[in-house]
């Protein structure tokens, strides 16, 4: 289960002696993780899409990432956006969607004139819809495929998600090996 969605209803097991925590993923001690990517069609980004992406990658956007249990970029620069008005559609991965919802809320505090529609589907739909222009920004909880990149998508990692290996709370297993 996604580290950002982990709760007390299940038990996360250690992998190779490391607990599933953001700090352990960041340090490399816990190795089960995946990137959260956004992608745009190169050259087709609107001013609003560029400004929103700038916010996501900024110190303020990455604070939202960290607050929601994901691994952020500690070296992000402060946001210095232009707050353009308009509408964009962001869509794709159901794993990225809860974090994107929080990022949209935080961005709209700075830019209330922005209209950002969020559509939750899956990573492949997010990428194909960014390629065909249905989505201004696509979301994927994986690396982009070569075929997607060859269609003109430009990907950016917005967070790293630790994947907690879980068992029933009553299960005796506390640790597994990656071997």
Please annotate each region the language model reported.
Residues 1-179:
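Exported/periplasmic ABC-transporter solute-binding proteins
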């Amino acid at each position: 289960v996604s580290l950002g969605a982990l709760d007390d209803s299940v038990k996360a097991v250690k992998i190779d002696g490391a607990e599933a925590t953001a700090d352990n993923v960041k340090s490399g001690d816990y190795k089960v993780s995946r990137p959260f990517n956004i992608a745009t069609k190169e050259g087709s980004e609107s001013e609003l899409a560029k400004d929103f992406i700038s916010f996501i990658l900024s110190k303020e956007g990455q604070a939202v990432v960290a607050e929601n249990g994901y691994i952020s970029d500690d070296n992000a620069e402060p946001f210095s956006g232009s707050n353009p008005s308009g509408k964009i559609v962001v869509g794709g991965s159901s794993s990225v969607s809860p974090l994107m919802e929080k990022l949209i809320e935080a961005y709209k505090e700075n830019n209330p004139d922005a209209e950002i529609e969020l559509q939750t589907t899956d990573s492949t739909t997010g990428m194909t819809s960014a390629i065909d222009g249905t989505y201004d920004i696509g979301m994927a909880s994986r690396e982009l495929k070569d075929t997607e990149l060859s269609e003109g998508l430009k990907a950016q990692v917005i967070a790293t998600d630790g994947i907690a290996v879980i068992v029933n709370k009553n299960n005796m297993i506390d640790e597994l090996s990656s071997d």
